[in-house]
Amino acid sequence: MNVRRAKTAGFCMGVSLALQKLNTALERRAGQSAGAGRICTLGPIIHNPQVLAEYETRGVVCVNDPAQLRQDDVAVIRAHGITRQVEQAVCASGATVVDATCPKVKKAQLSIARATSQGATLLLFGEEDHPEVRGLISYACGPAHVFGNAVELAALPLDPAQPYVLASQTTQDREIFTSIQESLSRALDDLTILSTICDATRERQEEARNIASSVDVMVVVGGRQSGNTRRLADVAALNGIATYHVESAEELEPKNFANKPRVGLTAGASTPKSLIDAAEKWLSSL
């Protein structure tokens, strides 16, 4: 089988930085005396089950409530960021805080705060229950609405005479956002547009589209909780070919690749190279 592997597959800059900060915290704690505080993350550091399981074996504790923190803990903020309110509670806990928020997400948070400082309504394109989106919304100084598609946007009671700010979750589909941007620009008199989709997301999606147009089937490797991985699968599937989103090579089935000699392989921004390598090896063996 001919496997075409995406060059952009695997860890993005934000994920690499977050894990580097977590590893540094673990190394420093290892050099301290017994009985030192815990290394904690505020929610999963990234959305990949294998990576999270590895850190759990190394003693990292995942907490979802700042009230669970102790003064001698090191609290590592997840790559997706957290809400302003949670961050304040973390700082008040007395724990040592390590901010591993992706720089692109942090920039989006601050851009939203500045753009809405006079009370403009935020329109955020994203997944309402995603931790990054909850964090972005918390930085809005005025009202805020989250929508996941054009239908949800059309249902919002927008007043053309009021000021609005349009932004996006950093891992959303760039083409869909551009279409939404053009539509709102025609409908609203006062619209500020923030470019918050990161370049890595755009490049991965463009490469996935390109590969999907020249193969018989696509495989996307990554955690099912990973929004950017799910969107890569969606982008590939739009080309009309079978697309399989798996967390590891163990989920691949030979029957899905029968009479399909060309396969495309990509992976989410939180997928380790080892998992991509394993999937490529499995596919190449067919």
Curated annotation (Swiss-Prot):
Keyword terms: 4Fe-4S, Iron, Iron-sulfur, Isoprene biosynthesis, Metal-binding, Oxidoreductase
Binding sites annotated in the UniProt record for [4Fe-4S] cluster: C12, C102, C198
Catalytic activity reported: isopentenyl diphosphate + 2 oxidized [2Fe-2S]-[ferredoxin] + H2O = (2E)-4-hydroxy-3-methylbut-2-enyl diphosphate + 2 reduced [2Fe-2S]-[ferredoxin] + 2 H(+); dimethylallyl diphosphate + 2 oxidized [2Fe-2S]-[ferredoxin] + H2O = (2E)-4-hydroxy-3-methylbut-2-enyl diphosphate + 2 reduced [2Fe-2S]-[ferredoxin] + 2 H(+)
Keyword DNA repair: no
Superkingdom field: Bacteria
EC code(s) of this entry: 1.17.7.4
Pathway in which this enzyme or protein is active: Isoprenoid biosynthesis; dimethylallyl diphosphate biosynthesis; dimethylallyl diphosphate from (2E)-4-hydroxy-3-methylbutenyl diphosphate: step 1/1; Isoprenoid biosynthesis; isopentenyl diphosphate biosynthesis via DXP pathway; isopentenyl diphosphate from 1-deoxy-D-xylulose 5-phosphate: step 6/6
Cofactor names: [4Fe-4S] cluster
Active site: E132 (proton donor)
Binding site for dimethylallyl diphosphate: H47, H80, H130, S226, N228, S270
Entry binding sites for (2E)-4-hydroxy-3-methylbut-2-enyl diphosphate: H47, H80, H130, T170, S226, N228, S270
MF terms (GO), sorted A to Z: 4 iron, 4 sulfur cluster binding; 4-hydroxy-3-methylbut-2-enyl diphosphate reductase activity; metal ion binding
NCBIfam families per the UniProt record, alphabetical: ispH_lytB
Name assigned to this protein: 4-hydroxy-3-methylbut-2-enyl diphosphate reductase
Organism of provenance: Desulfovibrio desulfuricans (strain ATCC 27774 / DSM 6949 / MB)
Native organism taxonomy: Bacteria, Pseudomonadati, Thermodesulfobacteriota, Desulfovibrionia, Desulfovibrionales
Name of encoding gene: ispH
